Amino acid sequence: MPEAAIDYLPLLAELQHRFHSSIPADLDVAIPTCGDWTATELVQHLADVHRWAAGMARGVNEWEEGPTEGFANYYEACARLLRETLAEVGPDAPAKTLVGPGPASFWHRRQVHETLIHLHDLRTPLALGLDGVPAEVWADGVEEVVSMFYPRQVTLGRTEPVPYPVEFVASDIGTRWQLGDGAPVATVTAPARELDLFLWGRIGLAHVTTAGDESKLAEALTRKLTP
């Protein structure tokens, strides 16, 4: 599946606004999908990532920890910095990416999906839900995992290749992806949203439909497909 025709920068701005608007007054709220993090760590993390990505879009790889208070304002500032940087340098500017030198447009897509997954993380324990994101956007997140993150994980030695080929099917839009070569031993089917969340470890097998060799599927899914 080729990269979707998504206008990433307006979508990024929308998702960042929703994230900022969802930051609770009580930052001690637990975020179960992020281990032992509270909202404090999640908000600071996404703000730090936005600031780092803005640097990467300019060809500078520098990571700095953010402040220890004023997290909502810090997030808003870092989100704005990222948007302004991406707009200023343009999509074709030479940048550093997660897979080597490439265009700054890499970060348009990457930060949309970074924000989307963490928006899910933030809103879920607050019982806010996450509606209004088109299936094609979630499907693009699946494509990013299959075509970029999984191969990168293997290249970096963070995981072994999947031992058996597995097919993923978005039941709402009919798109298919495959990890591994050859005829798939199993299929995982769900709406694109659930597939994306599943691949990022946000939901489990109870939220998808599987078919085929269950034992081989289970072994394949032990691989760490994302960071």
Annotate each PLM feature.
Residues 132-181, 187-188:
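Hydrophobic protein-protein interaction segments
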Residues 1-13, 17-24, 221-227:
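Actinobacteria-biased recognition of intrinsically disordered, low-complexity terminal regions
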